[in-house]
Amino acid sequence: MAEDTEYKKLPVEERCVHKLWKARVDGYEEAAKIFRELDDEKSPEWSKFAGLIKKMVVDSNALAQEKGLEAALIFVENSGLAGRTVGDVMTGIVQKCIAAPKTKTKELSVQVALMYVEIEKQEAVVEELVKGMEAKNPKIVSACVAATTLALREFGHKVIGVKPLIKKLAPLMSDRDKTVRDEGKQLAVEIYRWIGAAMKAQISTLPQVTLKELEDEFDKLKGERVEPSRYLKSQQEKQAKIADAAATEDAYNEDDGEAGVEEIDPMDLLDPVDILSKMPKDFYDKLEEKKWTLRKESLEVLEKLLTDHPKLENGEYGALVSALKKVITKDSNVVLVAMAGKCLALLAKGLAKRFSNYASACVPSLLEKFKEKKPNVVTALREAIDAIYASTSLEAQQESIVESLSNKNPSVKSETALFIARALTRTQPTALNKKLLKLLTTSLVKTLNEPDPTVRDSSAEALGTLIKLMGDKAVTPLLADVDPLKMAKIKECQEKAEIKIKVAGPKKETRPASAPTAKAAAPAKTVAGSVDPKPVTRPATTGARKVLKKPATVSGGGATSAPTAALKAGGKPLATEREITPEELQEKSEEILPAEILNGLVDSNWKNRLAAVEQLLGEISGFDAKQAGISQILIRTISGRKPGLKEMNFQVLKFKLDIIRSVAENYPLTTTTVDLVINEIIEKLADAKNGAAAADVLSAFAEATKLEYVVGKVLSFAFEQKSPKVQSEAFNWVNRSIIEFGFQLQPKTLIEDVRKGVQSTNPTVRASAIQMVGTMSMYMGKALMMFFDSEKPALKSQIQVEFDKNVGEKPPKPVRGVQRSSGGTAGNSPDNEDDDGGAAGEEEPINMADLLPRVDIAPQITEALLKEMSDKDWKTRNEGLTKLQAIISEARLIKPSIGDLAPALAHRLVDSNAKIAQTTLAICEQLATAMGAGCRNHVRNLFPGFLHALGDNKSFVRAAALNCINSFGEKGGYKEFFESEMIADALKGGSPALKTELWAWLADKLPGLPPKSVSKEDIHSMVPHLYAHICDRNADVRKNANEAVLGIMIHLGFDAMNRALDKQKPASKKDILAALEKARPNLPVKPLPKGKHQAPIPEEPKLKTVRGGGAGGAPGIQKSATARVAGGQDKQVPARKKDEDIDTSPLLCANSAKNQRLLDEQKMKVLKWTFVTPREEFTELLRDQMMTANVNKALIANMFHDDFRYHLKVIEQLSEDLAGNSKALVCNLDLILKWLTLRFYDTNPSVLIKGLEYLVQVFQVLIDEEYILAENEGSSFVPHLLLKIGDPKDAVRNGVRRVLRQVILVFPFVKVFGYVMEGLKSKNARQRTECLDELTFLIESYGMNICPQSAVREIARQISDRDNSVRNAALNCIVQVFFLSGEKTYKMIGHLNEKDLSMLDERIKRAKKTKKPTPPPSVDVPAPQRHDSIEIEDAEVGNGCDELPPPDEDGTFDQAPSSQLLLLQQQLQQLQQQAQQQKPSGPFGLDSQVISEIEKDWVRVDQMEQKPLLNVDISSLDEPIKVRPTRAGIHYPQEKFDRLISRQHYMQQTLTTSPSSTAGMTSGVSPYRSPMRLQHQQPQQQLENNIPNLADVLPKHDPQLVKVIKGVSSTDTLKARAAINELAAIIEAPEKQAVLRDYEEIFIQNVLAQFKNLSQIPSAQSVVVYQPLLSILYTFFHANILGKTLSVACIKNLMSALLNLMADPKLAVGDDSQYNKVINGICLKVLDKVDFTNLNCALIRLLRETCPEAKLPKFTDLLMKCIWRNVKMLPERSNELNYDAVILEVHEFMLALPSTWWQNRPSDTPMRTIKTILHNMAKVKGNAILQHLNQIPTHSELHTYLIRILKNFQKDGSASGIGASPQRAKEIASKRISHQTHDTVSQIFKLISDRDTKQQGLQKLYDFKQQNPDIDLSTFLQGSSAPFHKYIEEGLAEIERNQNAGSTQDNRTDVNYQNNGPDPDFWMDRLQYHMTGGAAKLASARSADDGSHMLDNKVVDENLCLNGMNAQKASLIKREKRDMSPNRLQHLQAKLAQIKKENHAQ
């Protein structure tokens, strides 16, 4: 048995490949377990198993194979590497699994296949399954078919492509195996379910019996709705949202109930065919034959080809289309015309969208041919024009359509109208803009009145269809002049019309998301007439809804149309709304506005109107922005109520305009509302007093809608006015708006308006317009001047002067933009945040060529001109070309539509007359310039002619052809040149001259073209010709072909070109390979292949932009390309190339080119060296920079070689050159570093390691020379270096660390720190770990000066990282920060969860044991000297030295600034020096004489009479503590509790401590120190000092107790109540309460969590938990030792929850208000129990967070009552208050909510409450409160207010009342102290201040107080410190105790336990006081409060004297006190607890 299980000791990976099948099963199961636990798909663990998955699925053992499939399924589902395994795994599944005997194995194999589909590997899965369908085993075939069917059923046809499956149906259906046939049938049915009837054509070849069976199955599926049941992983989240949205919408949309099959285009299932190659060679010749039968034969052949091959391959069909068009237009035989029309229809259908290039030439001819009346011809023409329309649009053919509707022939008009009607049934409404709609409607209305009834009927049908499509609202207003009879006919046609496509109509209104307000009477469901703003033409976009099977219909009036001015290119429509009727307006305005305002607006007295508008303006911001139509209601109320905006009083009008502006700024605004008032506001621009206000209103309108829309309205209305003032001011406003908003306008429209202004006769208007033109010139440049070329010279000179003012000025940045409202309306929703809102962004460059009006020269290209150009006489042809030149020159800019001119020019390009060809080339170049980008449409026709001319024998023709090609390329792009293999055809049969020129052109242009701009297939077609020409006999051809190799290699790559060599002859391979190898070094470095999860690299601009110069045209590219390819070889003889190519220059040259490179990068002239993966542009840039810097050419070639061995050679050469050429290294350092960064992205480790070794040498040289890296050098190197710090190889990581440590010495470490911080964002856990280690090193080396607080917070976030190494590194880094910053670290790290914080605390504890904190080097101050630790017998002894206590090792949270720290340490040193000089000789460093003087009157303890102790039965202490059982089984273990209570080994330790540790231990609790830290720090310090305490000997974070506490927050009420009962048993027992001391924070958090849970369930269910929960909370705060150390945040959250419960009537069930009483009692307990400082801070913080929120008023009132209660207690508890913390919290309140914020609030009571706190603190502290303002800026509101308070105190004489309450101050003032009494007390205090007489002074002071009990001594203690107060009080108390003790032997054991005596809590607290060291607390208080560096000398002397007296007193007590045994201490604790319990019971 031992041998059988031996394999379990092996790693999982080895078990998975073990020879023993049981071991493999175990390995597979363990692997599956590991896969389930991995939650990171990119975890390195996945890579260990990636290669094993394929073996798991083909395991020879059946059981192991099953387990392997289970593991593989989990792997594929969760791993990011699963995609890499699909090929091997699917092959194994198909071969071994899918037809396995075991059912589970088959099921698992199918599930794995489906999971691969889910992770988007469906192509590979289908490919393998299709291969399996060809297997010999029928079981495998049937299983593969079944799996494919299942995948198609679950994922749908969009994921599983059906095209390859349809091809397999025929063999599957005819297979001899019945199972295969049945599965094939199921697959066919499933395919039909998804694609419908489109499949039938594909299976028509099947046997009729099979077809009949399938048809029967298909009929069963009719009407079935199909949807995927499973989605790809990338779609799942999106589909879930879509499904939810669809479910919601379907509830309100009944018309979507019908199910339908999403139709698929049958053409998508076909393969395209090239029919051009199949056409007869004599086709065109036959088509020109005179005999019609021959022409018919030619067309029949074409028709057969088109019928047999419905889908056509892309190609050059221009000649075929022209031939068919010629037959249609010219042929007199109607049969041939019909055949040509049918062929044209088939051709258009076969090319689909690709026919668009030919549509414009065909449509006019077809419309014209409709004059033919033969039915067969008309039918054929209809089919043709309908097929062509699928590739074009009505807008593109509008001119031809309008012209045909004006034709004289009625048939043409009728058929054109019918064509429009048919086209509209297949057109989306959005395709018809307002201009086109108006044009069509106007033309059709004209034909509607034709005398021919056919024309009228056709026109009515077209108009009816138009109304059906667009809606009545859009079309009916354009039919106002149509008589009723014709309108009735149109309506009849509208009803009959049927839209044949799914119209993306406007989205239906759904229910409002929230209920309407109480005032608004809006219906529950929005109706069509709603005034809610909505997009005008917003289509429905429900992605989950399928297209209905039957054609959808659109009801009239369903769509609305937006004004074209409201649209911007690529923008979204503006919001509109329904115009409210006057009755509705009256009703709604009365609902929201008071009657006095409405009446005042129409009052005849202007003063009343003024008062009304003033009142309305003040209330304008208080309305509900979500109320429908609020803007329209308010604006129309102002403008619609007489006198409205016709107001004659300028003051009233000013307020009205301000109201409208405020509405536009604060509420959603639509164009409907703007249109109602904008004209009246534009008129007010001319108002002398209110013009500016009107302009502000227009600007507000522009912000709320769009600037373009408002500007259009303003200028349009201004020119309708005759007032020059209005026009002038309108131009002025537009001018200002352009500057404020940026140029967010359509320049073309604006230019037309401004030209009107420039041409105005009024000089003011003209001047304003000219000024606006000058502003426009800043945005549009000097080209704007061409629009004013036709103006008069004087006017042009004025415009030029304005242009000159703005020469060289950049447009200012926009300061205003589209308003972003949160109202939630359509007009201001995030959906409408388009580009118009980006006011702050840079304006897009304006293409002036697009703005210039273009002329359509198509009408001028007449048949006569074309005939003249094709005349046989060359002179006539030349005259025709000359006329054409004149036409183009006159038009200057033309439209791309030039009719049949392009084919005519193509014939002239190959003209036999060279002069004609040259002229034609010049015309083509002229066309490109005049046409712009549109010239690309004619490349297919003209480019073959250009290439022909490029091979002409005459050089001037070749030069003209080259210029023409370049012009077309620059204007329209080069992509079209490479399509259709035009270049390949030219190279194939061209002349040597053509080959030479064409290869030269390609060598020039190809390197500069972006890689993806040209299809690889098109370039690949040139490779065979390239190889042939490399070996051509012509030397020039060979030379230029060799030069073109690099350009082609850039696009195809070396490997692809190398593979193409296989088809070459062996004799040619050597030369071709040599050419490839020569070009290869110049090839740019390839970027890393993109992984599955890597973001795609965006396509970069052309290479010319890399150089960053101004002129980036063709010459620049040509020059650079030549330099890259040949390196000057065109000047050399090829025979001597090998010798002359050797570069003997130094590797690196010393020059000053580096400075220029740095300047270029700073000025953004070149690319910044920042990238994720190196792209080609960066490689080319670096190569060019190296060439410019004269780097050795051979070195450059090796640097950019694809083979890594060349890179190693480069590094070796550079290393050898380093020693003797360091100056050159510095000059080229940036280039070397950049090249090495490229190597960081290579995968070869040898290059990487060698490169790092070289970098170590380089930086050592730089360090020796004390060189400092430039900013550009460091920023281009360090970030890339950090990428390799997380490399898996140790050698690489170590090298990177070594280099980085060197970089710090030559580059500012602060910047290095920033780059390392950026490295934390990496997804690589190892990189994050290393970066954190480097940050630790930097912080340790350079201190906290380099580490901002935000960086510490970011580092702390890494503590919660999943990776353990990252967590440890982050913890180490924060520990280092803690050593330097102390407790301040906790504030810097921000919020951490409990788990992370506990880890950090534990790590800090451990680190402090091994390493002491060292101050950062930035503060060079000598450390304070510490005295040796002194062992004492009790913790009550103080420091025993008259110096400030040394700082606590744990530090404090709030550290003083560095300057204050320096001052404190200097003062500390002085005090230490004084102490050393005057060091007493007595014990503990005290003065023995003083000790003797103090001891002389004391009575020793052993001399006192012993008084018998009370006989108290303490047997109960030995009884076990009973724990109440609960139903949930939650309890604290009894044996553990007993062990904790009686842990004797802690009690028996020697009680020793040191002054420093004691002082540190008992320092006051900082209000900012979290309770979690207190739990760790205080017990740790107590254990270190061996101070016994019940709570301290308990375990910290006992898991069982934590489980009980966390049970309180359980959502299970039974479990929660059980946990509450368990805790109640602990809290109610005083002896057990100490257990919870360290769990207070956790307990409160869980209580709050339960409160949150209860708030979400009904009251009836929650009450049963509220009762015990509130009870235990009351008990908790009623306990003596609990609740005192809660943090500020915990108190704030608790008080918020309690006050919310009191404010919320949820718990007030019936008349019973007991719950509120209980909660009120809890609040009072909290206010009395918790730390007073933390309480005040928490309440102030809660008030700060409450005020801006919409909290219940009762909540705020309760909160302020709590604060007022604290204010009343302030004089009594002032000693407990940390003034610094409270004042800082008040400061934060005033910063967040300053006094200005309260001015607009209805009540400022909270602010006055806060000021009351300050007032009372100032009254208590007096001027001393200024000592607590260290953290408050002097310019703050708090500081100013305190100074004002103190000044008032001085005036009132109240500043002396420090430390007294107001009531006490009155009592003191009422009592007149005599001068003699005052002198007496002063003499007594002088005695106390003297060391020799202080005891005598205390006795006299006690006697004086006994004799004068009415005199308050606090008056005489004003100005002294708190420790001196405490010394006086304790001294008097000690004397009183001695007096009362009388003859008793031990006054500390004479305790009266009567009920009227002190509360037992007092004795427990006093016991705790003695245990933890009362004197230590005094020392801590002294260190916290005395502020010695701020007080005067008198107070300092008093404090120092006090220290000495404390030391003497402590020393005496310790000598006389007996040892207290641990047992006695334990029994005393238990006895006091018992007495306390009895006291409570009574």
Curated annotation (Swiss-Prot):
Knockout phenotype, as recorded, reads: RNAi-mediated knockdown in the neurons of adult males, significantly reduces survival to 53 percent. Adult survival begins to decrease from approximately day 14 post eclosion. Pan-neuronal or glutamatergic neuron-specific RNAi-mediated knockdown decreases adult climbing behavior. Glutamatergic neuron-specific RNAi-mediated knockdown also decreases activity. RNAi-mediated knockdown reduces radial microtubules in fat body cells, resulting in strong defects in nuclear positioning. No effect on the circumferential microtubules.
Query: According to its UniProt record, which protein family does this protein belong to?
Result: Belongs to the TOG/XMAP215 family.
Assembly and interactions?
Interacts with tacc, dgt6. Interacts with mv. Interacts with Patronin.
Q: Where is this region: TOG 5?
A: 1179-1415
In terms of one coarse class, where is the protein primarily found? cytoplasm
- Which portions of the sequence form the region TOG 4? 849-1087
What effect on the protein does mutating residue 606 to E have, as reported in its record?
A: Impairs microtubule polymerization, decreases microtubule lattice localization
Q: Which SMART domains match?
A: TOG
Ordered alphabetically, the record's keywords are: Cell cycle, Cell division, Cytoplasm, Cytoskeleton, Meiosis, Mitosis, Repeat
Organism of derivation: Drosophila melanogaster
What is its subcellular localisation?
A: Cytoplasm, Cytoskeleton, Microtubule organizing center, Centrosome; Cytoplasm, Cytoskeleton, Spindle; Cytoplasm, Cytoskeleton, Microtubule organizing center; Cytoplasm, Perinuclear region
Q: Which stretches of sequence are listed as region TOG 2? A: 267-505
Segments of skewed composition (Low complexity): 513-531
| Outcome of substituting residue 292 to E | Impairs microtubule polymerization. Disrupts tubulin binding
Q: Where is this region: Disordered?
A: 506-572, 804-849, 1083-1140, 1407-1455, 1940-1959
Q: Cross-referenced Pfam families, in alphabetical order?
A: CLASP_N, XMAP215_CLASP_TOG
Q: Does the keyword Cytoplasm apply?
A: yes
Q: Where is this region: TOG 1?
A: 1-229
Locate the region TOG 3: 581-814
Q: Where is the composition biased (Acidic residues)?
A: 831-845
Q: Which GO terms describe its molecular function?
A: microtubule binding; microtubule plus end polymerase; microtubule plus-end binding; tubulin binding
The name of this protein is Protein mini spindles
**Is-annotated flag, keyword Oxidoreductase?**
no
Q: Which domain of life is it from?
A: Eukaryota
| UniProt cross-references to PANTHER family, sorted A to Z | MICROTUBULE ASSOCIATED PROTEIN XMAP215
Question: Which residue ranges does the record annotate as region Promotes microtubule polymerization?
Answer: 1-516, 581-1080
A biological process term (GO) from this entry: oocyte microtubule cytoskeleton organization
